[in-house]
Amino acid sequence: MKKKERSASEKRDRLLGVATAAPAAILLCVFTVYPVIYLIYRSLYSGSLISLEKEFVGLDNYKEILFDETFHKVLVNTIIYTVLFVGLTMVLAIIIAVWLNSSRQKKLNNMVEACIFTPHVISMVSVSIVFLWLMEPDTGFFNMVLTALGMDKFPFLSSPSTAMLSLVLVMVWKSVGYYVLLVMAALKTVPASIYEAAELDNTPKIRTFFKITLPMISPTILFTCVVASIASFRIFDAVNVMTQGGPVDSTNTLVYYIYAYAFRYGNPGVACA
């Protein structure tokens, strides 16, 4: 009798588990598994987005991508952007977070936190439009200031040698506040007694930072680097609004390259590949 009751109870538990996991599994299949399968299927065919006729081309789309010099440049651009964005963002985030954590002026801290976090919640398109005007070669605000100071105009977005750096600086300005909050949260977990012991030993602040603070918050720094790297590989809005991949593909990144092939050149097969 007990075995039958136990068996019935186990069945109910299994059914409950299946019923609980089923909605999440269905959503995962619909929004993740199916799109991936369809992308692989679509990459084997040629044809435009508006045409129902598709021609099977096998691996030709993959060959076109692999031998496309623009694709190679796009990969290099994406890696350069990721390294610059993650590096600058993390250095600034750590410096600002350590300064705010050590400062005793609460009102100033609150004001600084609000100022650096506000750009993060603003639409990326809005930020891109504003900076596109600020960096405009002839009538942009930044170049107007440089001209007023008797300096030459700076080609922020109009030169292949400066466009990528300008784009990185805009993205760092927008995103650094979020990473500052993450690093500050990690700094709050460091026991104050460790710093007190370091002060009693007259340990220099720089040595305290590198020997105590940095190792204690290293897991959070690693996490933020991963998050920032993922975000940098997904950049699209700023490129689309500010540069459209130019000049001369100097800011063309992976996501924008895929978008351009699918919607500008009308070749979704290559985009899926």
Please provide the spans of the model-predicted regions.
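A structural signal for multi-pass alpha-helical bundles of membrane permease subunits
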Residues: S9-A273
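Short, Lys/Arg-rich, polar N-terminal cytosolic tail immediately upstream
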Residues: M1-K11
